[in-house]
Amino acid sequence: MRVQLVSALAFFAVASPAHAEWWEAKTDHFIVYSESSANNAMEFAQKLERLDMSLRSLQNIKFSPATSDSRRLTVFRFGDIGDIGRLAGYSGVAGFYIPNLSGSNAFTPARSAGLDTGQLLVNRPDSRTNLDPQQVLFHEYTHHFMFQHFSAAYPSWYVEGFAETAATIDLKPDGSFHLGNPPQYRSDLLFGMLNVSVERLLASTNKPTGEDQYGWYTVGWLLNHYLTFDPSRQGQLKQYLRAINSGTKPADAAVQAFGDLGKLNRQIQSYKSGRLPGVDVKIANYSPPQVEMRKLAPDEVAIMKVRMRSKRGVDKKLAPDVARDARAVAEKYPNSFAVQLALAEAELDLADFEPQALARAEAAADRSLALKPDSVDAMTYKGRALLERGRTDKSQLPVARTWFAKAYEEDPEHPAPLYFNYLAYYYEGVAIPESALIGLERAYDFALYDPQIKLVLARQLLAEKKGTLARSILMPYAISPHESKGAKKMREVVDLIEAQKVDEARTMLAHEIDEQERKRKAGQDAG
């Protein structure tokens, strides 16, 4: 996996206890890799599955298990907060989430500094105002859940405020849960260190400052809580979000839905000082989550650091280190499927910056397939290597498509083979068959959280003169055009669509996609 920006800090400093065990805990919606005891890993996985049940109950979404591992969130649980921060590239990070076409990933600590593995599951009421890694993970999973199930456009304050509301869900022993507890770790900011008004949160078009971004989490949580639980405001939040998605500017949508924003600001300031309401929810037909447990083999443990670094994402500076470390492990475990697959991924990432790595990536994919011929990931990596060759030798593209077709036959719900199959036609410059177009749309449905699919699908829809559909896909980027250069560009594309200039919109979007790829491969920030 690739990223545009990541700290240059190498991930060699992960502190692991001697002879640490690693367990895989698999539930209906999660695959957890945990550096802990088996019981602790199982309890943790059950807790995550219960969070998913709670969110489904709140959003009236059917309880159904994922039928493809690509639809499950993979959670890497290891080390302490310091180790998580080193992997993220930012100190003090207690957990983070990376959406990805081939399967999204989250990272969370398995232990507190100085404590034995697993003690984060123990309640510590003397630490209420400390940042709780469990609540961070609940927050990040709520993002994944929202992006996976809803394609609508949401302003940043609501995305973070809703996730903060869900982060403090209290899971009860009987299977019920409580919604509405305040995030105590935000209390200092809410009661004196932050000066972000409702007007500024909802109506500003200025480039957001660091204080504004803190406001998304704090004032955003407070506003979402108030609009959710205060009887006098019932229905206003839905009205506001509907207006934004219909094309109303966020500032206008806020006034239409909430009225006087100054009055709203005064009301939430009073609201935060009182006793906050909440609700107890009982899940119908609740039964404890089932967990499949498997202890990782020595080769899987040996490649785990490489795998986590790849899943976190690499840039031009880090990719060579990750690939080098993958090769070192592969020398020790030449007949390990897990190791060869991780090596193929690392070399593919490196090939973005060093084309000579492409042959090594394809060779590792071939070895993976020899060890496990039905591996969807190995088939996809093989196809991706051929796809990249096809950028300069178009005769490789039909061959690449055969591998994506095989991967699709093995797992029809995995978005990556569908997406790359479409790209193989697009790069070849031939008429794209209906089956590939449908495949791209299915990939989008399976991976609503992936930003690149959205841009590519919007480009295709514009080529088909389907401006209204393309606009709906781009709106999540366009509603806050001040947040980044890329978001501003998406706003310009949407403006062209709304002006019925669909061809110009497609040209601009295609150029933006190409420019982002060029900058990424050059090791630059694509903005």
PLM features: what roles do these ranges have?
Residues 20-155, 166, 170-172, 202-210, ...:
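Juxtacatalytic substrate-recognition/specificity segment
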Residues 96-119, 132, 150-294:
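Acidic/His/Gly-enriched intrinsically disordered linker/tail segments
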Residues 164, 225, 345, 384, ...:
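Residue-level recognition of tetratricopeptide repeat
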Residues 246-390, 413, 469-472, 487-527:
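Beta/coil-rich, acidic/histidine-enriched accessory regions frequently appended to metallopeptidases
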Residues 329, 367-368, 406-407, 442-443, ...:
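Canonical positions in the second alpha-helix
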Residues 332-333, 371, 410, 445-446, ...:
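Structural marker of alpha-solenoid helical repeat scaffolds
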Residues 402, 462, 467-485:
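TPR/TPR-like (Sel1-like) alpha-helical repeat modules
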Residues 418-427, 459-463, 485-504:
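TPR/TPR-like alpha-solenoid helical repeat scaffolds
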